Design a protein with these regions (language model features):
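Hydrophobic residues in beta-strands and at strand termini
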Residues: 41, 81, 87, 97-98, ...
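N-terminal lobe/hinge region of extracytoplasmic solute-binding protein
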Residues: 40-89, 120, 127, 210
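Extracytoplasmic/periplasmic ligand-capture domains
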Residues: 22-29, 72-73, 99-129, 143-147, ...
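Short, low-complexity disordered leader/linker segments with a strong preference
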Residues: 1-35, 146, 401, 405
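Residue-level recognition of beta-strand termini and adjacent short loop/turns
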Residues: 88-89, 151, 222
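A structural "hinge/loop" feature
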Residues: 41-58, 81, 108, 131, ...
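Surface-exposed binding/hinge segments that line
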Residues: 134-192
Length: 441
């Protein structure tokens, strides 16, 4: 695995870490003195219904907040709609206290009843298939927490057992407006499913989308742009009592091609750009002349990795989704360990990421409080092709006279790697993986 450093070009000189990427609008409390920002996304939103979203390219970080949020710089939990929370000594109960006088974007009060509705009627509803439903289940019995209203500002979650991720993962989910969505949850469509599932699609008029975040949707033009305007009822103010956000409008341009992202930025049509490894040198040379600044935002939380298809199921005709011969290789722990030793991550860092990156040996990001470092005992797989070959032969694999790897039945070990074709750095990673694996047969 390898990770790149998050490099972002900012065109407006007064920017700092205000908005380094479209997915991190929670950093919008920096004192920015501009009224409009132009950003880019590679894909249209697929829905305006938070609970039904499955796409990484969504409008929701702009328009919704949960009880708590994660600080985009130091990754610590901070109050959001809840001004505070208290965990019981036995860690089985968490009590949240909402901020006073919260409002939705239509001016109606946001209350504990909205929190109750969001979790009990939507997220815990077995008839509503949310992407994150399973992450809300706790313990061996996979049960949801119970939820209880204590008073007009306090709500209590009772967990079946201590569950540390609850605060960071579950309490950060968006709170939804009961007054706008309750009827759709309680009524069914012609197929017997809650109408909520098809409510607030991208064809919904923006004024009907009720939100609680810093922005609300002003307009959406498919394949072109989403325009956000500030939510006048957003709860947050600066130290002088001035309403946030400072930026009153965001134009989110929908441009699939990353090459066009670069062209639009260089022509001045975009205010921000996530810098790709292959374009870093070009932009760094243009930095002074172009009157923009490249900020090093630190390590990304995402990782690049190779994964094997371990699906042993079959289709309706009884044909296995994965060739049983290859499946046998993939399920062999020694085979996977040998692959890990065979990949030269340092070369990836130098050649593909131009030296701007760090090696990552865990699926858990270094910024996470749950990260285990190599110094703390995490097993690592440093580049060692000789060891990779040794592991393979000890596991029953063999080499022919041409040094080609064969399995125990004498079959040549070959498989395909699928990679996202729109991402040049990923293609380069896949090419190097191919070269490294050829080196062990």
């Amino acid at each position: 695995m390898s990770r790149s450093l998050r490099l972002t070009v900012i065109l407006v000189l007064s920017f700092c870490f205000a908005i380094l990427a479209a997915c991190r609008p929670q950093l919008s409390d920096a004192k920015i003195k501009t009224s409009q920002l132009s950003l880019v996304t590679p894909s249209d939103p697929t829905t305006f219904n938070y609970a039904m979203n499955t796409s990484p390219y969504s409008v929701f970080p702009f328009i919704y907040q949960g009880l708590v949020k994660e600080n985009g710089i130091n990754n610590k939990l901070e109050p959001a709609l809840a001004e505070s929370w208290k965990v019981s000594e036995d860690r089985l109960k968490i009590t949240f206290t909402l901020r006073d006088k919260l409002k939705w974007s239509d001016g109606k009060p946001l209350t504990v009843d909205d929190v109750m509705f969001t979790y009990k009627d939507v997220y815990f509803n077995e008839k509503i298939p949310t992407l994150f439903k399973d992450s809300l289940r706790i313990g061996k019995k996979d049960v949801f927490p119970s939820i209880r209203k204590l008073d007009k500002r306090r709500i209590e979650f009772a967990l079946p057992q201590p569950f540390t991720p609850f605060l960071r993962e579950s309490a950060s989910l968006a709170i939804l407006p009961a007054h706008a969505l309750r009827d759709s949850v309680l009524s069914n469509d012609a197929n017997g499913n809650p109408r909520f599932i098809s409510t607030w699609g991208t064809d919904t008029s923006p004024e009907k989308i009720i939100v609680n975040g810093a922005y609300q949707i002003e307009s959406y033009t498919p394949s072109e742009r989403v325009i956000f305007k500030n939510n006048p009822y957003y709860w947050r103010k600066d130290g002088q009592g001035k309403q946030l956000p400072y930026i009153k409008s965001i134009v989110w341009q929908i441009i699939p091609s990353t090459d066009n992202h670069l062209l639009r930025f260089r022509s001045g049509e975009l205010d921000s750009l996530n810098v790709k490894p292959e374009t870093f040198s070009l932009l760094k040379r243009e930095e002074k002349r172009g009157k923009f600044t490249i900020h090093n935002g630190g390590l990304e939380t995402g990782i690049s990795f190779v994964t094997f298809n371990l699906n042993q199921a079959s289709n309706s005709q009884g044909k296995p989704f994965v060739n049983p011969i290859k499946s046998r290789w993939f399920h062999n722990l020694a085979f996977r360990q040998a692959i890990a030793y065979a990949i030269d991550r340092e070369r990836m860092k130098t050649n593909i990421y131009r030296g701007i990156g760090e090696l990552q040996y865990s699926p858990i990001a270094e910024q996470s409080p749950y990260y285990l470092s190599p110094k703390q005992g995490l097993k690592t797989y440093s580049y060692n092709p000789r060891k990779a070959r040794k592991i393979l032969t000890e596991a029953g694999f063999q080499y022919n006279a041409q040094r080609q790897l064969l399995d125990k039945d004498g079959l040549a070990v070959k498989f395909n790697i699928l990679v996202k074709s729109e991402d040049e750095s990923r293609i380069a990673l896949a090419v190097q993986v191919q070269e490294d694996l050829n080196n062990i047969g």
